UniProtKB/Swiss-Prot annotation:
Organism: Prosthecochloris aestuarii (strain DSM 271 / SK 413)
Gene Ontology molecular-function annotations: asparaginyl-tRNA synthase (glutamine-hydrolyzing) activity; ATP binding; glutaminyl-tRNA synthase (glutamine-hydrolyzing) activity
Keywords recorded for this protein, A-Z: ATP-binding, Ligase, Nucleotide-binding, Protein biosynthesis
NCBIfam families: gatB, PRK05477.1-2, PRK05477.1-4, PRK05477.1-5
Taxonomic lineage of the native organism: Bacteria, Pseudomonadati, Chlorobiota, Chlorobiia, Chlorobiales
Pfam families with a match to the protein in the record: GatB_N, GatB_Yqey
Protein name (database record): Aspartyl/glutamyl-tRNA(Asn/Gln) amidotransferase subunit B
Catalytic reaction annotation: L-glutamyl-tRNA(Gln) + L-glutamine + ATP + H2O = L-glutaminyl-tRNA(Gln) + L-glutamate + ADP + phosphate + H(+); L-aspartyl-tRNA(Asn) + L-glutamine + ATP + H2O = L-asparaginyl-tRNA(Asn) + L-glutamate + ADP + phosphate + 2 H(+)
Function of the protein: Allows the formation of correctly charged Asn-tRNA(Asn) or Gln-tRNA(Gln) through the transamidation of misacylated Asp-tRNA(Asn) or Glu-tRNA(Gln) in organisms which lack either or both of asparaginyl-tRNA or glutaminyl-tRNA synthetases. The reaction takes place in the presence of glutamine and ATP through an activated phospho-Asp-tRNA(Asn) or phospho-Glu-tRNA(Gln).
Length: 481
């Protein structure tokens, strides 16, 4: 029997606010245990939560960016369950009346565009953290308690592990473009749970689903879904039944293992939080937040193609990350040359980032200095070959390209007299190659150019070298005739 994979994703996105969702405590990562806490975080008697407005703004921005309807009235609810790192005994979340409803993400997993529908986006707070690796005891760190999250829940529209990965990457791109999260899966800023089921191909009814947790990279999401899908098939074909449960992905053993029975919404006994008023969203707020939305990748890529006359593929690469796109545009502003800026950013800059495994924010060459370097090439001050040497030195030294060119004596030689002398020396030293050229084997012209550039240590203006070489070699051909 042929089976169809059905996947829905629940993604928790940690917001990069300075303070927590319902108190003024810092969200700074890596602080000593239980230092970013207050009576609200610790659920001390009488402590009352106050909603962070920035959390509401970020939720609405994400909702707008994914085509959701923004609720004019939404409610914060208590999700009741017991866990040692949940001080209050409940988590503040949203249930029946979330802030964003019915959106969509368009993805391309290699087989064309597909729309993955969103059920909802809602606000909630993170729990604390249990620490098990200190002796035989378990300790609680409440620093993370109350850190703001947005939960993004998709419909079960995903049909392959590749689509699941593409969906997550698209969502990560959006939250990074919005500037509401760093979207780092490895550090837990973007956490994904996958609901997986199988059904006979052609059937409309869904099979029993299992939930997979503990996936901290796009690749682990793919592998976990593929493993779980095959496990379902093996159980079904052996005549067994799938148990609805939560399973953990083991990245070392490349398998899932049972964690607990799957909870249902009624298990959490949701009810409106009496300490928090409902969230009211009016047209003025929507207008304000709509104006704060950035230009998104698809629109920005189309503009790059039109405005800078670069290929669609290049525009797609340059706009994949907002910081790269910003860097490129600033380089264009300084250099005035979109094509050259595209070539340098896509070539030398991205190569360097990949080799050093660093983000563009840590790159030592500013877009202004890269723009100056491109300008020196355009003016004929240096050649492309020398420019790459200058580029490498700019990474080592805190100096601009003009200063490096001056100090190192790298300025391009365009003096026809000096170049003509070298050209004549090369011609005189290679009579056999001259004869080949003059007998019609003009492809050997590149040999002469290379010899001239080598003799002048790459500083000669290639255009001037080409002109003088061609003139001298062609003169000989005319004379023989």
């Amino acid at each position: 029997m042929s089976y169809e994979l059905v996947v829905g994703l629940e993604v928790h996105c940690q917001l990069n606010t300075n303070s927590k969702a319902f108190c003024g405590c810092s969200t700074e990562f890596g602080k000593p245990a239980n230092t970013n806490v207050c009576p609200v975080c610790l659920a001390l008697p009488g402590a009352l939560p106050v909603l962070n407005q920035r959390v509401v703004d970020d939720a609405i921005k994400l909702g707008m960016s994914t085509g959701c309807s923004i609720a004019p009235h939404s409610v914060l609810a208590r999700k009741n369950y017991f866990y040692p790192d949940l001080p209050k005994g409940y988590q503040i979340s949203q249930f029946e009346e979330p802030i964003c409803l019915e959106g969509c993400l368009s993805i391309d997993a290699g087989e064309g565009q597909r729309d993955i529908r969103l059920i909802r986006i809602h606000i909630e707070e993170d729990a604390g953290k249990s620490i098990h690796d200190i002796g035989d005891d378990t300790f609680i760190d409440a620093n993370r308690s109350g850190v703001p999250l947005l939960e993004i829940v998709s419909y079960p529209d995903i049909r392959s592990s590749k689509e699941a990965s593409a969906y997550l990457q698209k969502l990560r791109q959006i939250v990074k473009y919005l500037g509401i999260s760093d979207g780092n899966m490895e550090e837990g800023s973007l956490r994904c749970d996958a609901n997986v089921s199988m059904r006979p191909r052609g059937e409309s009814e869904y099979g029993t689903r299992t939930e997979i947790k503990n996936m901290n990279s796009f690749k682990s999401v793919e592998k976990a879904i593929e493993y779980e899908a095959q496990r379902h098939i093996d159980v079904l074909e052996a005549g067994g039944t799938i148990v609805q449960e939560t399973r953990l992905w083991d990245a070392d053993k490349l398998e899932t293992r049972s964690m607990r029975g799957k909870e249902f919404s009624h298990d959490y006994r949701y009810f409106p939080d009496p300490d928090l008023v409902p969230i009211a969203v009016d047209d003025a707020m929507l207008d304000r937040l709509r104006k704060e939305l950035p230009e998104f990748p698809e629109a920005r890529a189309a503009r790059f193609v039109e405005e800078y006359d670069i290929p669609p593929y290049d525009a797609g690469v340059l706009t994949a990350e907002r910081e790269i796109a910003d860097y490129f545009e600033e380089t264009v502003r300084v250099s005035g040359d979109g094509k050259a800026a595209s070539n340098w950013v896509m070539g030398e800059v991205l190569r360097t980032l990949k080799e050093k495994y660093i983000p563009i924010a840590s790159f030592t060459i500013s877009p202004e200095r890269l723009g100056e370097l491109i300008g020196l090439i355009a003016k004929g001050t240096i050649s492309n070959t020398i420019a790459k040497q200058v580029f490498e030195k700019m990474q080592e030294l805190d100096e601009g390209p003009q200063e490096i060119v001056r100090k190192e004596g790298l300025a391009q030689v365009s003096d026809t007299g000096a170049i003509e002398g070298v050209v004549q020396e090369i011609i005189d030293a290679n009579p056999a190659q001259v004869e080949q050229y003059r007998s019609g084997k003009t492809r050997i012209f590149g040999f002469f150019v290379g010899q001239c550039m080598k003799e002048m240590k790459g500083k000669a203006n290639p255009a001037v070298v080409n002109d003088i070489l061609k003139q001298k070699l062609d003169e000989g051909m005319t004379g023989d005739a």
